[in-house]
Amino acid sequence: MSPDRRRRDLVLIDLDGTLIDSVDGIHAACARMSESVGIEPPSLEFVHRSIGRGADVLVGKILAGGRESESRDARHQKARAAFDQAYLECWQDGTRVRQGVFETLEALVSEGREAIIATNKPGRAADEIVRHLGLDRFVSGLA
């Protein structure tokens, strides 16, 4: 089957790593979370390698010393709550819109396309980030 090459009017765009670089804010939240549960904070490099599959997976890997972990016990729940609170407080630490994003979004809008941001960030943090960075003027929602 050949791909359908018709123009699409709806564009779904990933937030982290595509529209924004947020690793510094995530790292800051991981450090605060680690302190709250009494473990060594992860390095920036570890966080950079470990993000992308959601906060539950990231928190689990930190608690398990870098290994994949499916555990969602009370310790994990406490750490996840600490991470979520810390991220709301420090997501701005180094979070920035990537080069060329505003121009690309403006071009999509001027072509009559609708853009929606896809993210696995918690809703409150995602809403705040999109609004604060000015991405909300180009998109019709988050998924």
Predicted features, each with a name:
Residues 2-49:
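Active-site neighborhood of HAD-like aspartate-dependent phosphohydrolases
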Residues 6-7, 88-117, 123-127, 131:
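Short, acidic loop-to-helix structural element flanking the phosphoryl-transfer center
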Residues 10-12, 116, 141:
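Hydrophobic "anchor" residues on beta-strands that sit immediately upstream
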Residues 25-28, 54-57, 103, 124-125:
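Short alpha-helical
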Residues 33-34, 54-71, 129:
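Helix-loop "lid/cap" segments that line or gate small-molecule binding pockets
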Residues 40, 69, 111, 135-140:
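Conserved H-loop
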Residues 45-46, 50, 77, 135-143:
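A short, structured active-site edge motif that brings together acidic residues
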Residues 62-103:
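Metal-dependent phosphoesterase signature
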